[in-house]
């Protein structure tokens, strides 16, 4: 398979309702400086913020980039690809990211919850895309891998608070019942 036939993502942005960064990941050198990245984010936000992308993802073409986006509560999700990329693949990346975040945040997809769980969101991005190449779009697989990594990193049950231990036990029980 040639590199040209592989769909590439240029960036994934998670912005708040004012266009400020919550979590962003760039996979392209199209924006070489931090100032260029911030300018792009502001531009994308200003062009899309007036649309109603709450129920379904919307697609737009801005500066030779296809941008697929969706809003939830006070968060705005964006996936950017080149003008020749397949919109359906970009939309599936967006939906996979959105649904995985919703699973990890227990359907409480809002800015404060996202900021409190920023590590999970970045792990989610790492599981989905590597150097622009789409690895996974299934939200259950993504959330499962992230949850597995976060429980491994959290250490033993004695180091966790009681509520964290109960949540971990509940997740392990649910996983064992499903398999």
UniProtKB/Swiss-Prot annotation:
Its main location: cytoplasm. InterPro entries: AP_mu_sigma_su, Coatomer_zeta, Longin-like_dom_sf. The keyword Protein transport applies. Keywords: Cytoplasm, Cytoplasmic vesicle, ER-Golgi transport, Golgi apparatus, Membrane, Protein transport, Transport. GO terms for cellular component: COPI vesicle coat; Golgi membrane. Gene3D superfamilies: 3.30.450.60. SUPFAM superfamilies: SNARE-like. The keyword Membrane applies. It is a peripheral membrane protein. It is found in: Cytoplasm; Golgi apparatus membrane; Cytoplasmic vesicle, COPI-coated vesicle membrane. One of its GO terms (biological process) is retrograde vesicle-mediated transport, Golgi to endoplasmic reticulum. CDD domains: Zeta-COP. The coatomer is a cytosolic protein complex that binds to dilysine motifs and reversibly associates with Golgi non-clathrin-coated vesicles, which further mediate biosynthetic protein transport from the ER, via the Golgi up to the trans Golgi network. Coatomer complex is required for budding from Golgi membranes, and is essential for the retrograde Golgi-to-ER transport of dilysine-tagged proteins. The zeta subunit may be involved in regulating the coat assembly and, hence, the rate of biosynthetic protein transport due to its association-dissociation properties with the coatomer complex. Oligomeric complex that consists of at least the alpha, beta, beta', gamma, delta, epsilon and zeta subunits. PANTHER family: COATOMER SUBUNIT ZETA-2, ZETA-COAT PROTEIN. Belongs to the adaptor complexes small subunit family. This is Coatomer subunit zeta-2. It comes from Arabidopsis thaliana. The lineage of its organism: Eukaryota, Viridiplantae, Streptophyta, Embryophyta, Tracheophyta.
